[in-house]
Amino acid sequence: HKAPYRFVYPGKVYRNETTDARHERAFFQYEALIVDKDFTFSSGKVMIKSILSKVFGRDVPVRMRAGFFPFVEPGFEIDMGCLVCGGKGCSVCKHVGWIEVMPGGTPHPNVLKAAGLDPDEYTGFYVNIGLDRLVMMRYGVDDVRLFHSADLRFLNQFR
């Protein structure tokens, strides 16, 4: 296949980490990658805002912070205003009113070279969409661990 590329692929991620209200050892995500000659970082930012407004049925506060991921340059982390507490601060957002929902960035030139593409000709946009956190925000769930619990009273809400 030749560029341009547009991929969206789902997956379940397993991590060896301590669990808390925002972190679980296993979670679901979508990864999206666009590689094209004219796809800009600004286009990616518009795409992110569009995804979030579709998921939540309205515009939500969004901010982008610099972040490091070895396969993108520059890298960023996308935060949205915490909908569990309305941005006032809670255990989900660590009392700051924001929660990270998507890391991403522009594919690193070495990634493009490894795909047989000239990084001077092609650019792109990568984002990792954490579904569990988006569902937390959409339904006001204050603990991600509940999704993997055996509590049928909680789980039956989502039939």
PLM regions: where:
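TRNA-recognition modules of translation machinery and tRNA-sensing kinases, especially anticodon-binding
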Residues: 1-159
